[in-house]
From Swiss-Prot:
This is Acidic phospholipase A2. The lineage of its organism: Eukaryota, Metazoa, Chordata, Craniata, Vertebrata. The keyword RNA-binding does not apply. Binds 1 Ca(2+) ion. It comes from Bothrops pauloensis. On the 2D-gel the determined pI of this protein is: 4.3, its MW is: 15.8 kDa. PANTHER family: PHOSPHOLIPASE A2 FAMILY MEMBER (PTHR11716), PHOSPHOLIPASE A2, MEMBRANE ASSOCIATED (PTHR11716:SF9). One of its GO terms (biological process) is arachidonate secretion.
Length: 48
């Protein structure tokens, strides 16, 4: 979910940049269609 994603980003980046992922790729944000574009998008796909 988005809370877990925010926590993960905080641990890796040391700051909250989760808002930059809301419209990233095909699956980061709400819903999604098509093939995931990269590893980050695949992570969003798995958690959707």
């Amino acid at each position: 979910n988005l809370v877990q994603f925010k926590t993960l980003i905080m641990k890796i980046a040391g700051r909250s940049v989760v808002y930059k992922y809301f419209y990233y790729g095909c699956y980061c944000g709400w819903g999604g269609i098509g093939q995931p574009r990269d590893a980050t998008d695949r992570c969003c796909f798995v958690h959707d």
